[in-house]
């Protein structure tokens, strides 16, 4: 969606009137599964038991009164949800593409009866053999980058000559954090031709447009009440619409209130489960530590018909070389379809697996060449030649300098490296002192991605200074801490009391809310736009009569810094940067991992409330630690967080730790064990076997 004009002035404010049909209304602090009605019926999704094939027949005989079975035929020709120009069947009409694909809906007043009825459904399928990947020679999405003097394959090969270090690594990661959120679903009523949907939607416009088309309803006949969201994953953004459409069909066809709640297993398997990504990196490193060339191969199993596959792949490519200046870069990235559910990614750290790979590769280069972590990184930062991607990396050197001065990283790194090199692990003769390691990792968090229509900074912020001196902010409901930042920001610019500022989170059908909530809710972007609104109002308030309304969005000039066709330039509106140092010990008898300390230095612009920001980062660190080892919840009592002083606009802190801490952990673990740990989450039995085998040393190429 093209950005609208950056400024807008209106003489009359836009209060939400009761007679204006509403597209979106927040139902705060309410879970949809807590809603109930006297004539409510439950809905259960019937899923395919086969992986690949066709439905020959699907019948249920002797359906009790008050119970219903719905199939694809009940949707007619509109049996699909459209997302980013990709059509996904709501219920399989014939072809089956993955095990668990929805094929029917059961509805009735007693949920346990639905479980019994499901067992009585007679299903006949024509099965086909299903390979793991559908067609590997035809990727579902792909991206190829080659930058530098070496433009031909043979020229690239020459860079990996004997005079340079030729260092290869394969890094695999997938962190599926346990979800404590409500399982997804919807609560729908259809009364007097008005469809009301209560659901944890994160993309109300997407839901509304699909509902209108599928059921032939007018805009004013669809009312969406947003309940508490279930997490910022790509599948929860668009598949919530699929689920809400299913519940809506039941409500419309039966005339009863319909509730559809996924089971905890369904919510994980089909909405939030992520897929492992293996990234292969080959680095040509000169004797002076300069990385002359890097080759990266990213292969992603995106599942069946994933509308976000290209988006995910592009973000991985952008992060694949981190902030480093390498003269010759080749990145090949491919996403393949498979006979599995569409893969989901966490929007807040969509590129974390790329950072895990490149930062572990940097640590491996340190191990092989003997350079120190900060020394190697600074040798390959801000070199003067053209790169495909540019980032706002102010004060990166200051961050590394602060880490070394404050935490004595280099001395510990050298000491632990000597211990590791000289240690010979013998299962019959364990040492009586802990195995120690220290890991360093860095990375950025790009805010406001210009690379696609849906994540292309299409956000808008509207603020109105009313006649009575109060300020109304028209935006989606943010977190309590973010709202406090907004009020303080606006109050300071307009010189009013924060108590005079109120939030309006109701959007009527005539207002455009075309991008997902996760995009609108980006704290840094929306705070920036609010600041611009307030500055605009302040410049006019003594020359124009109140009320004054200002609407701000991103200008075309701001978006032109990224060339979408050439896939080059500055991909983000803002970037935050962070460095993490993690120190650990391993008990030589129990092989239990003890996190001694975690140190983080972050550059996130001007920090409004430092204590809140510090506590937020500490919570992020503790949360990230719980995901690193299978069946273990690591924690740390010694966490230190520092912020680089800056007067720039504040940038995003959330998601930064989850991008860089995993690599710091595996780097430290590799040093402690003396063996390369290239997969996360870590299985304790895996590194135990590695250690006693005395193979796969971190000091080999």
Where are these regions (language model features)?
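Cofactor-binding beta-sheet edge motifs in enzyme active sites
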Residues: 2-398, 414-701
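Divalent-cation
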Residues: 403
């Amino acid at each position: 969606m093209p950005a609208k004009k950056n400024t807008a002035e209106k003489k009359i404010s836009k209060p939400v009137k009761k007679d204006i049909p509403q597209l979106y209304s927040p139902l705060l602090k309410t879970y949809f599964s807590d809603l109930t009605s006297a004539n409510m019926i439950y809905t259960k999704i019937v899923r395919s038991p086969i992986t690949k094939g066709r439905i020959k027949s699907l019948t249920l005989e002797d359906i009790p009164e008050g119970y219903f079975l719905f199939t694809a035929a009940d949707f007619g020709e509109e049996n699909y949800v459209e997302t980013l120009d990709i059509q996904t069947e709501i219920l399989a009409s014939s072809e089956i593409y993955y095990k668990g694909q929805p094929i029917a809906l059961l509805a009735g007043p007693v949920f346990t009866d639905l479980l019994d009825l499901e067992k009585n459904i007679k299903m006949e399928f024509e099965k086909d053999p299903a390979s793991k990947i559908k067609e590997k020679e035809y990727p579902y999405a792909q991206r190829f980058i080659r930058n530098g003097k070496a433009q031909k394959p043979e020229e690239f090969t020459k860079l990996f000559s004997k005079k340079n270090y030729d260092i290869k690594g394969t890094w695999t990661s997938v962190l599926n954090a346990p979800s404590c959120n409500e399982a997804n679903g919807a609560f729908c009523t259809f009364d007097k031709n008005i469809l009301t949907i209560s659901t944890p939607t994160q993309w109300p416009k997407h839901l509304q447009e699909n509902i209108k088309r599928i059921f032939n309803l007018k805009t004013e006949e669809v009312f969406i009440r947003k309940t508490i969201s279930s997490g910022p994953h790509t599948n929860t953004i668009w598949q919530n619409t699929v689920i809400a459409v299913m519940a809506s069909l039941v409500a419309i066809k039966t005339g009863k209130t319909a509730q559809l709640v996924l089971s905890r297993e369904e919510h994980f398997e089909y909405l939030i489960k992520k897929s492992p990504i293996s990234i292969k990196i080959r680095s040509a490193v000169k004797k002076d530590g300069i990385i002359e060339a890097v080759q990266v191969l990213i292969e992603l199993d995106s599942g069946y018909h994933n509308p976000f596959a290209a988006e995910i792949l592009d973000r991985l490519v952008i992060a694949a070389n981190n902030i480093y200046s390498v003269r010759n870069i080749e990145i090949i990235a491919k996403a393949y379809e498979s006979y599995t559910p569409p893969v989901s990614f966490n929007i807040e750290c969509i590129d974390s697996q790329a950072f895990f790979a490149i930062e572990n590769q940097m640590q491996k280069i340190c191990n092989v060449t003997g350079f120190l972590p900060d020394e190697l990184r600074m040798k390959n930062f801000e070199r003067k030649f053209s790169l495909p991607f540019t980032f706002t990396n102010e004060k990166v050197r200051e961050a590394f300098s602060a880490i070394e001065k404050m935490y004595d990283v280099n001395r510990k790194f050298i000491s632990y490296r000597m211990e590791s090199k000289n240690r010979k692990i013998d299962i019959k003769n364990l040492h009586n002192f802990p195995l120690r390691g220290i890991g360093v990792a860095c990375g950025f968090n790009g805010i406001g991605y210009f690379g696609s229509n849906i994540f292309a900074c299409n956000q808008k912020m509207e603020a109105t200074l009313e006649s009575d001196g109060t300020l109304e902010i028209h935006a989606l409901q943010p977190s309590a801490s973010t709202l406090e930042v907004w009020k303080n920001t606006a109050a300071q610019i307009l010189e009013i009391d924060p108590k005079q500022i109120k939030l309006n989170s109701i959007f009527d059908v005539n207002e455009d809310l075309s991008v997902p909530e996760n995009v609108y809710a980006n704290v840094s972007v929306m705070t920036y736009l609010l600041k611009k609104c307030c500055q605009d109002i302040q410049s006019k308030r003594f020359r124009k009569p109140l009320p004054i309304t200002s609407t701000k969005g991103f200008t075309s000039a701001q978006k032109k810094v990224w060339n979408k066709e050439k896939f080059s330039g500055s991909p983000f509106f803002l970037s935050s940067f962070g460095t993490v140092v993690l120190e650990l010990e391993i008990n030589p008898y129990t092989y239990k991992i003890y996190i001694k300390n975690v140190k983080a230095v972050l550059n996130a612009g001007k920090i409004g409330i430092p204590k809140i920001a510090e506590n937020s980062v500490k919570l992020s660190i503790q949360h990230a630690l719980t995901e690193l080892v299978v069946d273990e919840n690591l924690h740390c009592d010694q966490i230190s967080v520092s912020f680089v002083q800056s007067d720039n606009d504040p940038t995003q802190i959330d998601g930064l730790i989850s991008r860089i801490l995993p690599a710091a952990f595996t780097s430290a673990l590799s040093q402690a064990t003396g063996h390369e740990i290239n997969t996360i989450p870590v299985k304790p039995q895996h590194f135990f076997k590695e250690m006693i085998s005395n193979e796969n040393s971190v000091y080999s190429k």
